[in-house]
Amino acid sequence: MSTVAGPSTPAGTDERLMRTSPLRRLLGRPELGSVVGAAAVFIFFSIIADSFLRASSLGTVLYAASTIGIMAAPVALLMIGGEFDLSAGVLVTSSALVSSMFSYQMTANVWVGVFVSLLVTLAVGAFNGFMLTRTKLPSFIITLGTFLMLTGLNLGFTKLISGTVSTKAIGDMEGFDSARKVFASQWTIGGVEFKVTILWWAVLVAIATWILLRTRFGNWIFAVGGEADAARAVGVPVIRTKIGLYLGVAFAAWVSGQHLLFSFDVVQSGEGVGNELIYIIAAVIGGCLITGGYGSAIGSAVGAFIFGMTSKGIVYAEWNPDWFKFFLGAMLLLATLLNAWVRKRAEATK
């Protein structure tokens, strides 16, 4: 009996061992479209606004980007996991309100209020994750309900405790100055002021990127976002993963809330409404798919940077700020189309 051997494969050319070409690797990066968009926005405002290129403008743009980017990074991870959080914007305000009102009413060290706020904020995140995994309802419905409840609680408790829609000043209380150094300080480098939120942003993006690319939990995130049932079938802890993602969003909301409080000393109970959409937009511009299973934390940072350049570029160009929402919507559409095109090109090169 004879056998017919197939064509031999030269040593070192096994398809499984072949290195991916640089072009294929580049096209496969989720943030590619956002990087192109960021370059276009930078060039655009550099041409029409002379002050945009000043060194002092860099700190302003980065600060605007960081206030969005701190939240956009965990929101991006949540979207990669196939879920949304429409309560993220008001949760930032809730975090600030709890810290302020607890410290003021209990006449306690401000750090006690900050710690209580962390527990409350994480509890809200756990609630979102628990309700999502137990009820099987869409995250849109679950977090929309949380959004409405928090909006009412923020206003109702603030009026009940302080008698107005804003909190009382706590700037003279023990622990305020040290907390401000952690959450709302700034430093000067080369005559340019940089806010500490930029550092928080960089650290959170670095951690999120490490989780996605270097840990088992990162693999779980992509798996549950791609196909939760299939992921569950191969042993991925879907429930634990999704609750963990909501806890990540809650932690970032706590950081942002403390910055809000210690920057202005008082907090308006109606703040934060609508910001959840900006976080989602930054993640989508950065390459995250609405359907889940695809995206990156670095892309969310680029998306937030585009937000910062646009929001401040319009001011430097002396345009009416009302145009900002138009540009934001246009960038969302263009980024989505560009990301779809990049993905098709990446698939075509496989």
Model feature map: region roles:
Residues 253, 263-329:
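Transmembrane alpha-helical segments in multi-pass inner-membrane proteins
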Residues 108-117, 123-128, 190-267:
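Helix-loop-helix "hairpin" substructures at the membrane interface of multi-pass membrane proteins
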Residues 31-36, 61, 69, 90-94, ...:
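Hydrophobic alpha-helical transmembrane segments
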Residues 41-106, 130-137, 283-298, 330:
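Single transmembrane alpha-helix segments in multi-pass membrane proteins
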Residues 34-46, 75, 147-155, 200-210, ...:
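Hydrophobic core segments of alpha-helical transmembrane domains in multi-pass membrane transport
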Residues 107-147, 303-306:
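Alpha-helical transmembrane segments within multi-pass membrane transporters and channels
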Residues 1-43, 47, 233-240, 310-350:
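Cytosolic-side transmembrane-helix boundaries in multi-pass membrane proteins
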Residues 139-215, 243-244, 264-272, 347-350:
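Transmembrane helix-bundle core of multi-pass membrane transporters
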